Structure formats: C-alpha cells, structure tokens
Amino acid sequence: MEKTYNPQDIEQPLYEHWEKQGYFKPNGDESQESFCIMIPPPNVTGSLHMGHAFQQTIMDTMIRYQRMQGKNTLWQVGTDHAGIATQMVVERKIAAEEGKTRHDYGREAFIDKIWEWKAESGGTITRQMRRLGNSVDWERERFTMDEGLSNAVKEVFVRLYKEDLIYRGKRLVNWDPKLRTAISDLEVENRESKGSMWHIRYPLADGAKAADGKDYLVVATTRPETLLGDTGVAVNPEDPRYKDLIGKYVILPLVNRRIPIVGDEHAYMEKGTGCVKITPAHDFNDYEVGKRHALPMINILTFDGDIRESAQVFDTKGNESDVYSSEIPAEFQKLERFAARKAVVAAVDALGLLEEIKPHDLTVPYGDRGGVVIEPMLTDQWYVRADVLAKPAVEAVENGDIQFVPKQYENMYFSWMRDIQDWCISRQLWWGHRIPAWYDEAGNVYVGRNEEEVRKENNLGADVALRQDEDVLDTWFSSALWTFSTLGWPENTDALRQFHPSSVMVSGFDIIFFWIARMIMMTMHFIKDENGTPQVPFHTVYMTGLIRDDEGQKMSKSKGNVIDPLDMVDGISLPELLEKRTGNMMQPQLADKIRKRTEKQFPNGIEPHGTDALRFTLAALASTGRDINWDMKRLEGYRNFCNKLWNASRFVLMNTEGQDCGFNGGEMTLSLADRWILAEFNQTIKAYREALDSFRFDIAAGILYEFTWNQFCDWYLELTKPVMNGGTEAELRGTHHTLVTVLEGLLRLAHPIIPFITETIWQRVKVLCGITADTIMLQPFPQYDASQVDEAALADTEWLKQAIVAVRNIRAEMNIAPGKPLELLLRGCSADAERRVNENRGFLQTLARLESITVLPADDKGPVSVTKIIDGAELLIPMAGLINKEDELARLAKEVAKIEGEISRIENKLANEGFVARAPEAVIAKEREKLEGYAEAKAKLIEQQAVIAAL
C-alpha cells in the first residue's frame, strides 16, 4: 500500500469502476426484502451545497448498509425543474448577455433557451453527487419534466379535476409584482421592519354617534394605500365602545363609499384603536373576515403593484359585481403602491381626518427571489381541494403507517394538516408543466390530457378555436408525485410493485408541508394495493436539521459564509475562495466584510480532506432533527482518522502478507489480547447496528471512531507486539488470523460511512482471507454473534489497560522520560489482580516499559513511592534516583504561575461589559470553556506539588 493516504488518487477512479460494474443497481432478487430511498430531487441547474451533502451522506449510508444485508436496494435519483428558480436564472442570463427579456423571445423560444441552459448546466449537480460517493442507480435517473413524469402530472391533474378535487377560483395569493406570479408561502421571507401605524377618522353615517359622543371612528392601519379598497370596518363584538354600532355604517374618506361596521373577533380591543379597516382583496385576514360577513372585494392594484385606473368589484364568491362603483379618484390612478401610500396619507391629512401617526414594528413579506414586498392579490388561480386528500394522510401518521424521526415533527405535521387550506397550484410562469386546460371563445373550460382528447370528449369540431391555459403548475405539484411517478406510474410496472412504498424519506423539516405532506396526500389518493387500500409513499420520514456555520448562522451567499462541500474534499486556495464568496454578488456592498471574515477564518484557504473525511464528519454531526453548527476542527479530526485507519492497515499488512494467517488450517493459539479484540469487536457490531437501525448516525460514527482509534489501533496493535516479537508458531498464527479477521470485518462495518478508503484497503486484505469477491460493496454486513461473548477476556484486558495507563500517568506527572524502564510494585493485591499479573507479565512489561514487576507481601509497605489505586491493587513506583525533588517543585511552580496568568486574562475579558455585549454567544461560551480547562489543569498541578513535597 502507498505510504500515505491520498484520497485524490483513489476516489474518482474507484467510483467510475463501481458505476461501470453496475454495483449500484438493485440486485433483482425478489426473494429478498426490498429497500428503496427516493432522493429529494435537487434543482437541475443548481450545484451541490452542504444541505445536499449532509442528506445524501445519510441516504448513501443507509443504502450501502441495506445493500450489504442482501436486500434488493434502489436509490432512485433525479432532478427537479424548479420552475421559478430556473426561469429567473435564464432571465438574468439573457438580460446580462443579450440585453433581452423573455418577452422579446416569446414563450416557445424562451422555453427552448431554458432547455439549452439545462443541457449546458444540468450535469453539474449529478457530477458533484458522484464525487460524494452516492451509490444511486444512474440508469434510472429522472427529471420532473421528462416525458414520463409529464404524462403522470397530466394524468393526476385530469383525474383530480374529474373528481372535482381541482377547481379554478378567484382567491387571494402571495403575488410577486416584480416576477408577476403567484408564489408559495415557502418563497416568502418575512422581515422585521420599523414602520408606522396611521390613525385615520372614518365619519359615521346617518348621524350615528360612538359611545364617547364622537361622530367618527378612528381606524388604525399600517397600509393606508389600501383604504381605496375598504368594504367594511370591524370592531370586537365584546367592545363596549363600539358594540352598539355594529350594523351601522361609515363613509369611507376620499371615496365616499358607504361601508358597514361588522362585529368580528379579528378586531382586538387592545390593539391600535380597536377598529380595523377591512380590505378583503388586499389582506389575508381581511379576506377571511370578508367571507364571514359577505363583504364585497375591491381590487385596486395592477399585477405590477400600481393603483388601477378603475377598480375591480367582486362579490364574496368572486363574481363581478356592481354593488359599489369602480371609480378611483384620478389623483391616485397609476401611482406606484408606495407613492400611493404617501398620496393617500397627504389627502386624508388635508381633509383633517389624520388623527396621529405612531411608530410601529411590523413584519413585512418579501419574495425570496424577486426581493420586493409581496402583495396579497385577488387572482384567478387553480386550486386543489386539500381537506378530502388530507384526511387519510393524517390517519396514516396517527396509526403508525408512517413514522417521523424524531417523533416531535408529527405534531408540526398534524397542526398543519388539521387546519389545511386549499392549495394554489397555478403559477404565472413559462417554465414548468403547462396546465392541461383549454378555453373556447365563450370562456368555457375543458380539461384533458391533450387538445385532441379535449375535442373528442367534448365533440368540439375543428371550427371551434381553443387556447390552452397560459399558466404552469407549482413545482411542488410534480414533486408531490415523486415516489410513484419515478417508478413508471400510471403504468403498472415491476418497479412500482417491487419498490413502492419506499422505505425512508430524508428531508429537511422546512418542507414538511410543501413536500412531505403533499406526497402523502397524492400517493394515498392514487396508489392502492391489490386490496384497494391506499399505499403510503414511505414508511419513515427522517428529518434533518439545517447546517449552519460555526457561529450558528444560516449559510447564505449574502452572509458570505457558504462552504462548498467539494472545496473541503479537493481543497481551495484563499484567492479562489474569496472570488467564490464575493464574485457576482446581489449586494456587492457586503463584499468587504465577507473578504475580511474569510481571510481571518481561512488564512491559507481550505486544505483537501477527501470525501470520506467529509462524509464521516457529516454522519458524526447528524444528531436527530437538530441544526448543526459546522466545525472545521471535526473535519480535520476525521481526516486524521482516515490516516490512522490507513496506517494501521499498512501495519497489519506488513506483518501478515506472506505469513501464515491460519486461513488454511494449522494450530492456532489466541492470546488474551486476541480474545479481547474479537469480543470487543463483536460488541461494537451490536451497538453500531442498533445505532444505524434507529437512525442515530452520530452514535454509529462515534462507535466506529472509538473502536478503530482507541481499541484497535492504540491498544490491540500494541498488544500484538509481544507475540510478534517472540510468540510460538501457534500464537503467531492466532494473532495474524485475528489481525486480518478484525481488520476485514472493520472495513465492512465502516464501509457505509467511508466507502472509498474501506474498498481500497479491503482489496488488499481480502487476498489474505481467501475472499475472491470483486467488491466490499456487496459483501455481507458484519453480524453480532451471541456465542462469541467473552466476559473474562474483556474484564482481564480492561484491568491490564488500567494498570498500563496508571504507570503512564505517573511518568507524565513526574516528568519521567517515556523510555526509562521503571520498577513496579503491587501492594494489597486481590487474587484476581495477582492472577492477571502472573498471566500477563509480558504484556505489562512491554506496554508499560517496566524493568521488573513485584507483588509485595501483605505486611510490606514498600519504599517511598508515587502510588495509584486500581481495581484490586495499589501500584507503587519507587522514586529513588528518578527525580530531583527541588527541581521538580520549581518546574511545577512555574507551570502554575503561567496558568494563573491565563486565568486572570480570561476573567478580565469576561468581566468587560463591552466585550460581553458585542461578542457572539458562541465566542463567549468558548472563553468560558477555556477558563474551566485552565482551572482543572491548575488543580492537577497543585495535586502533583503535594505528592512530590511528601516524598
């Protein structure tokens, strides 16, 4: 084997070999259980980020683990067309390169442009996924707009429409005036901002008076421009100030519209003035109030967010109405919405109706892609009736057919599903699945799989002109069909029979509603088993947290704290990293701050760590459902782990290749150390499998690390040396056999988390075991064997380790050179302790570097010594001639003084109010941690001073 571990040399060639050999495919053995994971499809033109790397590492670990258990495994891969995101990228591209808009191109040509862009950049993410070692079946790769998936989408739309579960209606949506499309709640970013609350007088009609004798109500609003669309004023029915006015009217300022006063819980007595203006066409809460009181809806805005020239008036059901005039005062027509706000306030003030303006903290919705304030807008959209679909989806989780890990996310799911709103599925975009609906000139709507079918079903001749709906479906609509459409539905395929329901879905909790819930609803509606019972899309939902930076901040381009997973694999220089973080930024003014932070954090750029180290770190940080603060130190630690495993394997191979390892017979004697490591490994297998089976990848990674680093490398390899340097033939054969057996098993155990290094080493080790198989990927996963439990070997070895560590600690504390042989005396020995010493003198002398071992008679106190107490004995190391008492005390005093200096430095820092107020929580916690560490170190040194002073 190469002297040093170089992941760059082994990873890519190995992956290409695996893929070419077809190892990632299902084994097709239908007598075995199936195990299937559907990858959450990343955006086709996107690139891999830490969230992908994290979730995909977890999925690949599960898939490799199940594949090694002989199951028929499928990891279904594919990408998402990502409607709005992809369209925006291409719009920006043609604007920058050609100075054109999509309208200059026209719909067909612009869509061709997007397909071109997909062909050009669509391979980036799948290339990057290969670099992670993902063992997905590439031959089955799907795209949400490929022909098969597009047919499935049409099929679902048509069937739901025919079942009256899809309808077209006029409803309020989140409208992005910049992108001119409806967007989902997930694409709305709520920002806290400082605003105002305007208090405006609305004169009472018909000579009515309020309880305080005034002839007006004062209405509080944060959006005075929408006053032009008011159709009511709400007061709380319990409010003594106003309850007698319910059913009376006010005259709307500026417009002179006569609008009713309604009693509604939506008006809080304590908030503002207790009177709320109701604008059903421009506010989600008002829309609901309007429905409860049958108030008309008046839309005053264009799709660009400007004031219309004349308003649109609708009744509660969304039909056009003439109950109110559609006139808008000329001075406000065509004004941009925020200019209109100023103009309305000025006009109200001029009439003497502006009572006061108060500062007010409010939450303002922004479109996360367009970056402008979102407007609730009354538009014609297509909707899915969600309550019918939600009922079985709630029951599936209630009765345990689907389980969430961790369980607390079920509550989040229930709270949303039990209060579900109809789902707006239409988007005013060009890129996506076009809605399969056609209109004739009279505005009648026909839904079908294609125009030909529509004409045939509805007996429409060629003389009837039809135009297809311009809108496309919400991206989440096609994603909701992902688990079954990718397996060939609506055809009844073998794949669907074998792999559906899938086994586990790995997802972030932020998309429980947008994706997880909708997959459950759609799947249970369309997929039934042979008895007609609805099928679930998956049995388990494993929820991951978000990956944040080391200070707990969300990773984002604007913060400049994004780390590309492949930069940790391959390494990146500081100039390249700076270019990546500050090049073509949306907000260039942040570049300087980002540059400084990056230079401080990565003065030399990022070193290459290899894929296995990245995967190990991700697995180790995967504590269920919690957000993860990324830690470069952990990544370095796991790269060191890979080096340690590599070097340990070289040691094993150097000592066993060309030797008789007992795989072809011959007498074998196992030493205590051999018996111990076999028993220890057996226990490790049990604990490790339990961790993987319960989705505790963090615990599994910890078990693997602890066994490999501490038990196998640090202890067992050392404990083999006495046998290697002087054992009998049978003993040598026993130790060689154990070394190879445990290493080979360990490589299989570790393979799901660190596939590249384990395969590379295993190819050498398998020869010694007489294994002829091609790849570790298809080897059986290690199994716990209850008959291999060896309590005696475990107990005896733990005792020896205790004794060796005690001697090593005395050396360190007394500053004795590691190579100097020592005398060891044992006092007050139990029978077990004496037996253990007598049976294992060779081990003890070699590993603790001892010149002699003497068990003292019961009444012998022994010479002046440093002592340590272990189980069933007291260890003594005589100090005569080993240390100079005065020098040693002086050295310790110096150490104590140095540590006291550090302690007072940190204490002063933490006492500085300015530092505590400014520094991030994480930095303060780190300082406190350091302080604790120094305090412990000082206590230990003082203890040592006392021991030496007493000699």
Curated annotation (Swiss-Prot):
InterPro entries for this protein: aa-tRNA-synth_I_CS, aa-tRNA-synth_Ia, Anticodon_Ia_Val, M/V/L/I-tRNA-synth_anticd-bd, Rossmann-like_a/b/a_fold, tRNA-bd_arm, tRNAsynth_Ia_anticodon-bd, Val-tRNA_synth_C_sf
Top EC class for this record: ligase
Segments carrying motif 'HIGH' region: 42-52
HAMAP family: Val_tRNA_synth_type1
Domain notes: ValRS has two distinct active sites: one for aminoacylation and one for editing. The misactivated threonine is translocated from the active site to the editing site.
Family affiliation: Belongs to the class-I aminoacyl-tRNA synthetase family. ValS type 1 subfamily.
Function: Catalyzes the attachment of valine to tRNA(Val). As ValRS can inadvertently accommodate and process structurally similar amino acids such as threonine, to avoid such errors, it has a 'posttransfer' editing activity that hydrolyzes mischarged Thr-tRNA(Val) in a tRNA-dependent manner.
Subunit structure, as described in the record: Monomer.
Protein name (database record): Valine--tRNA ligase
Chain's gene name: valS
